[in-house]
Amino acid sequence: KEIRSLEIGNGASRVSTLGFVRRELVRQQQAMGKKKGVVMDGRDIGTVVFPDAEFKIFLTASPEVRAQRRFEELQAKGTPVSYENTLANVRERDERDTTRAESPLRKATDAIELDNSRVTITEQLQWAMNMFNKITKQNE
């Protein structure tokens, strides 16, 4: 639960701008994924950590939708925060992560994009499973 706190998210984004931190994290993530069948989430997983992964999903949503989701999540935890500050935080983090020199956030050319702004979690899972089955059948 603590990993989803505002402070942890912001701290991770700031620390991720440091090259030596990014390189060590990539090394550790790659070690965890040596055996196939791993599912990882992160802003550079498909481009830097596992550029040769067989199946990549690039999830996206508008900053406003992501801010609303984050705002509701933080409010449910009792964290005093405004929607406006949450939206500003989402935009700042996106800017920092897309412009950092080491492992910037970008979509892998072979990733399948899903804009989940107006899609339920159940619909996202069904879509992902359908795409996975389609791709794995093509690779057999």
Model-derived features: where do they sit?
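Conserved catalytic network of the ASCE P-loop NTPase/AAA+ motor domain
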Residues: 30-33, 48-51, 79, 104-107
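Short, well-ordered beta-strand core segments
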Residues: 38, 54-58, 111-113
